[in-house]
Amino acid sequence: MSQSNSNVQISKIAGREPDTSMPACEPVFWRVEGSLLNLTAVRPVGFFAWNSQSFLQRWTRRGAMATLAIARPFLYVTDRVFATRLLHTVLRGVSRDRLDLLGEEFFEYFLKPRLKARGIAKLNEAVAAGGEIILVSQGLDHIMRPLAKHLGVARIISNRLDFREGTATGRLLEPVIRPRGAFARFTQGQPDGRLSREKLIKVLGFEKNPEVMDEAIQPAGRPAPNVYVPVVHFESRNGRSSLSVRETLRGKNVLLIGATGFIGKVWLVNLLTDLPDIGRIYLLVRHNRAATSLQRFQRVIEESPVFEQLAERHGDRFAEFLRERIEVVDGDVSQPDLGLAAEAKQRLARSLDVIVNSSGLTDFNPDLRDALATNVRATAYTLDFLRECDRASLLHLSTCYVVGQRDGRVLEELPRNYTPCGIKDYDALKEWQSLENHVRETEARAESPEVTDELRRAALKKEHAAKDLQGAALENQIRKNRVRWLRQTLTDAASHRAMELGWPNTYTFTKSLSESLICNFLDANPAAAIAVVRPAIVESSLEKPFLGWNEGINTSASLSYLLGTFFRQLPSTETKCLDLIPVDLVSRGMTLISAALVARRHETVYQLATSVSNACNMRRSIELTGLGHRKFYRAQNGLEHRLRLKFDAIPVSKTRYKAFSAPTQKAIVQAINRTVEPFASRPPLARQQRELEKVIKLISLFEPFILHNDHVFEAANVDRLSAALPTNERADFGYDARALDWWDYWINVHIPALRKWCYPLIEGRQPEARPRRSVPLETRAESSAAEAKGATPAAAS
């Protein structure tokens, strides 16, 4: 991501406008063709056409160019403007996103090596003389912008395509910059490309309307999205007065549950960076057999890149800084009283102002026992603890996709006993108890003689097992099989029940159950201050803790990885929105909502999403993912990378996917394996069959989010909080999803972040190794004192 684009995007999200003012001086017009490059209009258009998204589009446009090649010389002689217009009709249907990326690529790999040194020297002389250079070219702005950036030029005159909904109509905008004459290459090849205003008007054929010259001058920077969605703010019970985050959270104590997670770590760093006057930050961390809670958190601090900049800022005092600001509390959110010791529980209940529960099991279809413990039981125990606190409020992190499998606009509301299917007599509390009972019954059934016999037969069925497995070895294998059987049975039961009620997976089902518990709690305790925060799909950071941070493979990483292979046909609905949001934008929202909770100016539900204010549909998401991969592969060497450039994924219907993609390919591979099975010791295409099965399973897992359920998530409540910020706090705490430039974010931030932090995990590798920091949070005296008290060592309060 270019520094200029990054600064513009970050400035807009923070609520401040970037400086785009131009110097007030007489400009110098500089013709690119002849002085800097020998550039024709045909070659870049041909490059764009040959690199269209689909194979059909490539050959269709190639054929159109071949046809034009016959007629264009005659048209060029009679009317150069019309010939130029006709040439660019070939690009009808190409997206602006693709043209912008291909324009950068064409300049970097084709034009940049061919720049004329003498012409650049002359241009630098003109710049040194104090004149503002305006590049003039017959080429499209998609090519001229990278050239201008390379030369440090701020404005250009070039041809521009008309776009409708991000797609080229094939029509050139006025004024059309006509090519030079037929012999200009031989008569106008001097390195000095300066033209007077009068001569340029004549050369371009603007004599009748010289005023169009000023209209033709455009900024050289890539235009940022101008997304404006009017929001009407009605007066509410909370009023419209200013909300200062710094003043509201000054001296306030926070308990963060889930500090070792993706969102939790980013929010913790933001608190430590942007709120120096906040009170004590307590972190609830569970110990394990190998490490105390403090040791676990210390390892996160020492190994996670999230804390690098904070560590560099404080240097040798980093550990001391953390001990002053943070206290690690041993506990377990899935246990009664949050697993806290009695003394710690009483102390926290008296002192806390905000509890932030960002814990959660994010696997789509986990073991039901794990899902209930982390997503449901943990919420119930957190609410019990909240009831015993003197003044604490609760920020509960959920997900937008608790809405389940239904279409339409999703309001910021907390319905009672909600199911996507609209079951009238559904009771969330009874459903939870039923699931807990099912777990106990299944655990008991796993020990039954019937299941044990089944597991024994399975153990002995394997090749050579009858003679190799006997006595203790056989019993040990049965025990392992029982663990797998129990896990698989409960996983299947949970996902089946979720789909039966209208949720796509266990994760969204159990997250919705936790919201129902909160709704019931608010009915019984109307004075309780609770905000349910629903982010959409949380992805790579835009600014904090640094540009392009991501972690894990539970969101879009696996799907985008697939689109970077030779896989081409993704079943999806083109107009459906894929609702992504950067993790640091979620963090900003959480900080705003925490302040609103403390000030008792909160709403019950906040959705942090982009589908209303800055939608990015599936068609565009798929193409941007492919363009992000293309930019990486184009910079690599090797035949495989060059081949992958040609395999852009495209959105297709489910019918076409089944007929021409992974399902049919799997059927063919299976048929081959069955045919040769009698003649081979093992199927020759067994690995390919397994890979195709993985692809089919992955597509099935993501179908609810890319093919079905067209959701539009309202997100007005957090916008109102951001609008209430005082001017001097908008840079640090302002929230504006409308300022996201999806092209820049996807290609220059998100895909590179996934490639750096997530794809290695998919490939069975570790992300790039970084030197481990030494951050001794636990002093020897503190450790001895904690052990003497029989408590888990933690930072001193």
Residue ranges and their predicted role:
Residues 349-350, 354-358, 365-373, 377, ...:
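Conserved Rossmann-fold NAD(P)-dependent oxidoreductase catalytic core, especially the SDR/UDP-sugar
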Residues 596-704, 709, 720-738, 752-796:
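Mid/C-terminal beta-alpha module of Rossmann-like enzyme folds, strongest
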